[in-house]
UniProtKB/Swiss-Prot annotation:
Alphabetized InterPro entries for the sequence: Isoprenoid_synthase_dom_sf (IPR008949), Terpene_synth_N (IPR001906), Terpene_synth_N_sf (IPR036965), Terpene_synthase-like (IPR050148), Terpenoid_cyclase/PrenylTrfase (IPR008930)
Cofactor needs: Mg(2+)
Organism of origin: Isodon eriocalyx
Protein name per the record: Ent-copalyl diphosphate synthase 3
Motif (DXDD motif): 354-357
Binding site for Mg(2+): 354, 356
Pathway per the UniProt entry: Plant hormone biosynthesis; gibberellin biosynthesis; Secondary metabolite biosynthesis; terpenoid biosynthesis
Gene label: CPS3
């Protein structure tokens, strides 16, 4: 390998792969091995091939403007992560109207929160409505009716009221055509209550349409599920929608406040209770919210847990989390501080939990080494079925989607996660078959694409660059809108800044990968490797797997070491498939002919070149370690059965990757290292065998085996649990990365892999 001016490492001299070879079990590839046969011609070819692998160091890889732009974007995102508080969220006109309805508790006759009334008067849209710029009929009607009602109550801005009423009259019939899946949270309770409130100030809304009758029926069903005695004594989701409800016992309800003085973090619900109780804790909560948002209030606040978790998730899936490891650790430390064995909600210290936040929190915490219990899912499960909130009538698709994602991080014996995986998988498959991938909590750019990717490429098979490439198309940035009581935006979660950095980063990585691939192709052609049975598709697959896993530009040495090792393995191991009458000649007399000399020369040369890079970078020689690693693999290739090849290949790639990365020698003798190596090689062996059988057995077309799944679960536990004396997390995760690459090629069919290769390595981002 050679280092370019751009700081990358590219192979100078690599090995070529002959069709025939002989293995000596007593002395395989010693560091002072002599090449047998007349190889002067081969050496000349080697020099020419080496030159073909060099990339012009004068090429303008480092574009100063792009680099500066990326630096600015990173700093902007880092500032967001470092300054997270209770959540950056857009204002809800509906909730602001309920806050503005509160009369001065001092008896002055005016509004208690005049700035809220001012916010409403300043934020009417041109068509007379209030609401998010994304038009959703439920959202616009609810927001507009609430704002007209409060302006009418205070006898202000008659012209704005008339304009708003005109919008309602012209559009209310369109509620019939709305998608029930996108109906705002608690709409079936909030809208009838708001109609009654509007009626008290002289605004009449017809309630005899089929839609309205259906809404009232849904309200009655929900109230039957949570009767009044339960409402007053146990925390339920109805605490989020108390506004306008009659016949409530206010003193009993005050016992169900959260620590911040709110009722399930709902400004509108809290404002309604405050109107009747003048409770000081409610007052302080509302005052804090109004001051934070300059008169307006969100539909829910705080949203700190939601913001911390979803921001980390987005950065990871976009492939840029490596820039913010310190900040991500701080985010997850914050979440873990408030984690409970009953799960979590969108805010800290809540008395109601939901499966969506719980699943997202569980998955991210587990994958970062935190100790989290599956008990968190118990209250969402009943007889093998799962719900978003205990007692609710419908499931949110994204809640089941995140439950599905969380279930794939299960350890052996975690039965509730096994049940969750089965239920959520079936739920999502049915929705996809029915073309019904629509969610009640978010309107995103490509939710069907997100769900489809998760189902088609499960966690064990999801290579980092592959996931990032798909999510770059699915993530809408600023355009993604959440559905609460009203539509709202999470400004740090769905953000064009994230998307812009992710695209620039991906393009930078892709450019490096394309240059490396061009060099490898030229090397392949110069050596005419097709003569040795190596197809260009196999060459490309080996590089793609390595580049999709070890993708960072600065890790070129590791990436190419992995790819070249896999290419060598593929070529040499393919000789085992020769007919019996020729195999003896292949394995027995290879060193006596010219091709055998080429093999030995290139294999030894590869070892020395890999080692020389480490000598330059780390100041230590790994030649003997690499040689020993290859000796073990070659011995298995000669003497072992098909069952052994996958295990041996995994061990070879693990050791080559770690030696190339400069991993400290003491790590190789660490007890955890041996555990991880055994678990990884075992499951990789099973995967290679399964992959071979799958090619001839149509019954194995989908899924894997119980033994493979159990092996992956064991490996996940070893990798993602921490102990007092442990390997560093990056080293542990490299074992999972290698197992993942084996799982990917065994799980995905050839057509899917070919399309993935094209998408990841060559397709431009729109």
């Amino acid at each position: 390998f050679r280092s370019t001016a751009a700081g990358r490492c590219l192979p100078v001299t690599c090995c070529v792969f002959p069709r025939h070879f002989r293995v000596s079990s007593s002395s395989i590839l010693p560091s002072n091995a002599k090449v047998v046969g007349g190889c002067k011609k081969n050496r000349q070819i080697a020099v020419e091939a080496a030159q073909s692998l060099e990339v012009d160091s004068q090429q303008p890889m480092n574009q100063e403007e792009v680099s500066e732009k990326m630096r600015q974007l990173r700093e902007k995102i880092r500032w967001m992560l470092q300054n997270m508080d209770d959540g950056e969220i857009s204002v809800s006109p509906y909730d602001t109207a309920w806050v503005a309805m509160v009369e001065d508790i001092g008896g002055g006759g005016g509004p208690q929160f005049p700035t809220s009334l001012e916010w409403i008067s300043n934020n009417q849209l041109d068509d007379g409505s209030w609401g998010d710029l994304r038009f959703l009929i439920y959202d616009r009607i609810l927001n507009t009716l609430a704002c007209v009602a409060v302006l009418t109550q205070w006898k202000m801005h008659l012209h704005k009221c008339q304009k708003g009423l005109r919008f309602i009259r012209e559009n209310i019939d369109n509620l019939e055509n709305g998608n029930d899946e996108m109906m705002p949270v608690g709409f079936e309770v909030a809208f009838p209550s708001l109609i009654q409130t509007a009626k008290k100030v002289g605004i009449k809304i017809p309630t005899d349409s089929p839609f309205m009758k259906n809404i009232y029926a849904k309200r009655d069903l929900k109230l039957r599920k949570i009767p009044m005695d339960i409402l007053h004594t146990k925390p339920t989701t109805l605490l989020h929608s108390l506004e306008g409800m009659e016949g409530l016992d206010w003193e009993k309800l005050l016992n169900l406040r959260t620590d911040d003085g709110s009722f399930l973090m709902s400004p509108s619900s809290t404002a309604y209770v405050f109107r009747h109780t003048k409770d000081e804790l409610c007052h302080q909560y509302l005052l804090k919210s109004v001051n934070k948002f300059n008169g307006g209030v969100p539909n829910v606040y705080p949203v700190d847990m939601f913001e911390h978790l979803w921001c980390v998730d987005r950065l990871q899936r976009l492939g840029i989390s490596r820039y913010f490891q310190v900040e991500i650790q701080e985010c997850l430390d914050y979440v873990y501080k408030y984690w409970t064995n009953k799960g979590i909600c969108w805010a800290r210290n809540t008395n109601v939990q939901d499966v969506d936040d719980t699943a997202m929190g569980f998955r991210l915490l587990r994958l970062h080494g935190y100790d989290v219990s599956t008990d968190a899912f118990k209250q969402f499960e009943k007889a093998g079925e799962f719900c978003s909130f205990p007692g609710q009538s419908t499931d949110a698709l994204t809640g089941m989607y995140n439950l599905y994602r969380a279930s794939q991080t299960m350890f052996n014996g975690e039965h509730i996660l096994a049940d969750a995986k089965e239920y959520s998988t079936n739920f999502l498959h049915k929705k996809r078959l029915a073309n019904a991938i629509v969610d009640k909590w978010i309107i995103t750019k490509d939710l069907p694409g997100e769900v489809g990717y998760a189902l088609d490429v499960p966690f064990y098979a999801s290579l980092p660059r592959l996931e990032a490439r798909f999510f770059l198309e699915q993530y809408g940035g600023d355009d993604d809108v959440w559905i609460g009581k009203t539509l709202y935006r999470m400004l740090y979660v769905n953000c064009d800044t994230h998307l812009e950095l992710a695209k620039l980063d991906y393009e930078k990585c892709q450019a490096v990968h394309q240059l490396e691939w061009e060099s490898i192709q030229k090397w392949y052609r110069d050596w005419n490797l097709v003569e040795f049975g190596l197809s260009e598709r196999s060459l490309l697959l080996a590089y793609y797997i390595a580049a999709s896993t070890v993708f960072e530009p600065e890790r070129s040495r590791e990436r190419l070491a992995w790819a070249i090792t896999a290419i060598l393995v593929k070529t040499i191991a393919s000789q085992r498939q020769l007919p019996l009458e020729t195999k003896g000649e292949s394995l027995g007399s290879i060193l006596e002919n010219e091709d055998g000399g080429r093999l030995i020369e290139f294999l030894i040369n590869t070892i020395h070149q890999l080692s020389s890079e480490i000598v330059v970078a780390e100041g230590r020689d790994i030649t003997q370690q690499l040689s020993n690693t290859w000796q073990k693999w070659l011995k298995t290739c000669k003497e072992g059965g098909d069952d052994d090849l996958g295990e041996a290949e995994a061990r070879l790639i693990v050791h080559t990757l770690h030696l190339s990365s400069g991993l400290d020698e003491s790590s190789f003798s660490h007890p955890k290292y041996h555990q991880l190596l055994e678990a990884t090689s075992k499951v990789c062996g099973q995967l290679r065998l399964f992959q071979s059988r799958k090619q001839v057995d149509v019954d194995l077309a989908t899924g894997t085996t119980f033994q493979i799944e159990a092996g992956m679960q064991e490996l996940v536990k070893l990798v993602f649990t921490n102990s007092s004396e442990d390997l560093d997390s990056l080293t542990k995760q490299s074992f999972f990365s290698i197992a993942r690459s084996f799982y990917y090629t065994a799980y995905c069919d050839e057509g899917a892999i070919n399309s993935h290769i094209d998408k990841v390595l060559f397709e431009k981002i729109d």
